[in-house]
Swiss-Prot record:
Induction: By Ammonium chloride. Its main location: nucleus. Pfam families: Homeodomain. Initially expressed in the anterior dorsal region of early embryos and later exclusively in the primordium of the anterior pituitary gland. SMART domains: HOX (SM00389). It comes from Xenopus laevis (African clawed frog). It is found in: Nucleus. GO terms for molecular function: DNA-binding transcription repressor activity, RNA polymerase II-specific; RNA polymerase II cis-regulatory region sequence-specific DNA binding. This is Homeobox expressed in ES cells 1-A. SUPFAM superfamilies: Homeodomain-like. Residues 103-163 bind DNA. PANTHER family: HOMEOBOX EXPRESSED IN ES CELLS 1.
Length: 182
C-alpha cells in the first residue's frame, strides 16, 4: 500500500464523531428510527387536501405536503398513505366545493327571504346610507347579522349606480341615433 493511502486510511480511523452541525445530524440521518413510529409534520393547507367521491365512498386525494421529521419516513408506500387517509373520521372531511370556497376567502352566501328583501328595500328608499343603529335594529328584526345588512346596502347602492349609468347610456344612445337619422 502506498504511503498516501496509508495516511488516508489512518485519518479515516481517527475521525471524530459527526458534529451537531453536520448534514446527517440536521436531517436526522445519524439516528436510526422506525419508519412506522416516525412523527409527521402536517402543515395546515386545506386548499390542497380535497375529497373526491368514488364508488359511493369518500376517498382523499394523496397529499404532497406531509413532511416526515426523519428522511427515512419518506419511504412509506402509497398503500399506507391511502389507508391513513381513509381511516380519518368523516367529520374531518369537507366537500371539494366548500374547501375551494374557503380557499378563495369566501363565506357561504346569505339567502334573503322575500319579506327580508321587502323590508330592506323600503328602508333603502328612505335612506340608502343607514347608520349602525338602524342596521343593528334591522338585524334584530330580520334575524340577520349586522354585517350582512351592511353588505346588502353596499350591494344595493352599487346596483342603483349601475342602473343609473345604464339608463344614462341609453338616453345618450337614443339621442345620438335620432340625430344620425335626421
Amino acid at each position: 500500500m502506498s504511503t498516501g493511502l496509508q495516511k488516508g486510511s489512518r485519518l479515516m480511523e481517527n475521525r471524530s464523531p459527526p458534529s451537531s452541525f453536520s448534514i446527517e445530524h440536521i436531517l436526522g440521518l445519524d439516528k436510526k428510527m422506525d419508519v412506522a413510529s416516525s412523527p409527521i409534520i402536517k402543515h395546515h393547507r386545506p386548499w390542497i387536501e380535497c375529497s373526491s367521491k368514488v364508488d359511493g365512498t369518500f376517498r382523499q386525494i394523496p397529499l404532497i405536503y406531509d413532511l416526515p421529521v426523519q428522511v427515512d419516513a419518506m419511504r412509506r408506500s402509497a398503500e399506507e398513505e391511502t389507508k391513513i387517509r381513509l381511516d380519518r373520521g368523516e367529520e374531518e372531511r369537507l366537500t371539494y366545493k366548500r374547501e375551494q370556497s374557503w380557499y378563495r376567502g369566501r363565506r357561504p352566501r346569505t339567502a334573503f327571504t322575500r319579506g327580508q328583501i321587502e323590508i330592506l328595500e323600503n328602508v333603502f328608499r328612505v335612506n340608502s346610507y343607514p347608520g349602525i343603529d338602524v342596521r343593528e335594529e334591522l338585524a334584530s328584526k330580520l334575524a340577520l347579522d349586522e354585517d350582512r345588512i351592511q353588505i346588502w346596502f353596499q350591494n344595493r347602492r352599487a346596483k342603483l349606480k349601475r342602473s343609473h349609468r345604464e339608463s344614462q347610456f341609453l338616453i345618450v344612445k337614443d339621442s345620438l341615433s335620432s340625430k344620425i337619422e335626421e
